[in-house]
Curated annotation (Swiss-Prot):
Any one GO BP annotation for this protein: translation
Gene: rplK
GO CC term (a single one): cytosolic large ribosomal subunit
Processing and modification events after translation: One or more lysine residues are methylated.
Subunit record text: Part of the ribosomal stalk of the 50S ribosomal subunit. Interacts with L10 and the large rRNA to form the base of the stalk. L10 forms an elongated spine to which L12 dimers bind in a sequential fashion forming a multimeric L10(L12)X complex.
Keywords for the protein's UniProt record, in alphabetical order: Methylation, Ribonucleoprotein, Ribosomal protein, RNA-binding, rRNA-binding
UniProt-recorded name of the protein: Large ribosomal subunit protein uL11
Pfam family of the protein (one): Ribosomal_L11_N
GO molecular function, one term: structural constituent of ribosome
């Protein structure tokens, strides 16, 4: 018989650097989860994605055990890294802060398509192109 789920919640944690301090410690502690066990498991699983904030879905069971599922970093973070810039613009209509090639956008699609709500590469390209547009990043050939 499957374990009974007590609660499911989401967090964004920097890859490889989960520690018991806020916001991780309080979020887990109030649910009765072993904080250090979570931190060690999360850091081990995400050590290859350093520099990104990783979305994680934590499932807590009634016996206070837990499982967690990591997702890919946010599309905006992947795009910023591919474009080689620190942050997007506050006014994407007037200000363009950088550009990204279609080849680099395809690399981002390869990483992110599992987490998007589509399996079609063309639709995924449109989703990520919209993200680029809203950040003030142009797509060039």
């Amino acid at each position: 018989m499957a374990k009974k789920i007590a609660e499911k919640f989401k967090m964004m944690i920097p890859a490889g650097s989960a520690n018991p301090s806020p916001p991780v410690g309080p979020a887990l502690g109030q649910r009765g989860v072993n904080i250090m066990e979570f931190c060690k498991a999360f850091n081990e699983k995400t050590k290859d994605k350093m520099g990104f904030k990783i979305p994680v879905i934590v499932t807590v069971y009634v016996d206070k055990s837990f499982t967690f599922e990591t997702k890919q970093p946010p599309a905006s973070d992947l795009i910023l890294k591919a474009a080689g810039i620190k942050k997007g613009t506050d006014n994407p209509i007037l200000n363009k802060v950088g550009s990204i090639t279609k080849a680099k956008l395809d690399e981002v699609i390869d990483q992110k398509i599992a987490d998007l709500n589509t399996n079609d590469r063309e639709a995924a390209a449109k989703i990520l192109a919209g993200t680029c547009r809203s950040m003030g990043i142009e797509i060039v050939d």
